[in-house]
Amino acid sequence: MTSFTVSPPPHIKKKIFIKNLIWSRIVALLPISAAAVYFFGFAALGNIIASILGAVGIEFVIQKAFNKKLTIMDGNAIYLGLLLALICPPTLPAWMIFIGGAFAVGVGKHAFGGIGSYTFHPSLAAWVFLSLAWAQDMLPGTIPILSSFSDLILENGAGFLTDVSPILVLLAGVILILVKYIEWRIPLSYLLTTVILALVLGDPLAYVVSGTFLLGVFFIATETVTSPVTQNGRIVYGILCGFLTVIYGYFSGNYVWGTLYALLLSNAVAPFIELKTLPKPMGGVANE
């Protein structure tokens, strides 16, 4: 007997190719990358290039070794390498982030079966790997604090590349939502949960809102492979991400790392959330 499984609604009613989705995210990250290069100089540019080369290089090697179709032009390896570079400090040696980019694609992506099959976001998995392998080098020089409105535009206390300009990350995320390349439920529930819970606990939003946090909200948490496909599941997932971010940030005093570790833990339970929020089939019963 052959079974055919269809994912729960909403279903896309127009042609949107994965390649288009990926490249749209890359384009959205370009202004953020440019701001990082402007602020940090050639160190940032070198790390971005090294991370992308590591990701693209290992993709080429793996697909050639196993006689698979080369998919470099779909942009996925480029995107994963770029995203990893943005959540690393500019002081990280280029050879380390090259290894990180290779780890993201070689282990985080292909070891789990390739695009569409991984449990953890590959860039996030690579960030954790780098943090464990070279903990001292991965420590940001500073923790960003928004002391004035101008810090939203250009943050002088940026620790990671993406922390340079939180407003650019926010604008990029909002634009992707407006063009429907990002579904709004996860970012909204994640953002609201984090802000409300942080205020309840008495943490100033200046400590909470950073480029890394917003990148997590709009780009990492919304990764379609590692987040639930159900509408209710996405809301629950966003709430969980926000809750874990604040709990880690509140007790550690570091909302930047809190964001990334919260997303990693949320990735782990995303399949369970999806299972428990599947819509009741017609004539059937909901998942217990």
Swiss-Prot record:
Gene Ontology, cellular component aspect: plasma membrane
Keyword field contains Transport: yes
Keyword tags: Cell membrane, Electron transport, Flavoprotein, FMN, Membrane, Phosphoprotein, Translocase, Transmembrane, Transmembrane helix, Transport
Compartment(s) of residence: Cell membrane
Principal place of residence: membrane
Transmembrane segments: 26-46, 47-67, 80-100, 101-121, 126-146, 159-179, 200-220, 235-255, 256-276
Keyword Transmembrane helix carried by entry: yes
Reported phenotype of the disruption mutant: Deletion of the rnf operon abolishes growth on acetate and ferredoxin:heterodisulfide oxidoreductase-coupled Na(+) transport.
EC number: 7.2.1.-
Domain of life assignment: Archaea
Family as reported in the entry's similarity comment: Belongs to the NqrB/RnfD family.
Function, as annotated: Part of a membrane-bound complex that couples electron transfer with translocation of ions across the membrane. Catalyzes Na(+) transport, most probably coupled to electron transfer from reduced ferredoxin to methanophenazine and heterodisulfide reductase. Involved in heterodisulfide reduction during methanogenesis from acetate.
PANTHER family reported for this sequence: ELECTRON TRANSPORT COMPLEX PROTEIN RNFD, ION-TRANSLOCATING OXIDOREDUCTASE COMPLEX SUBUNIT D
Subunit structure: The Rnf complex is probably composed of eight subunits, including RnfA, RnfB, RnfC, RnfD, RnfE and RnfG.
Protein name: Ion-translocating oxidoreductase complex subunit D
Natural source organism: Methanosarcina acetivorans (strain ATCC 35395 / DSM 2834 / JCM 12185 / C2A)
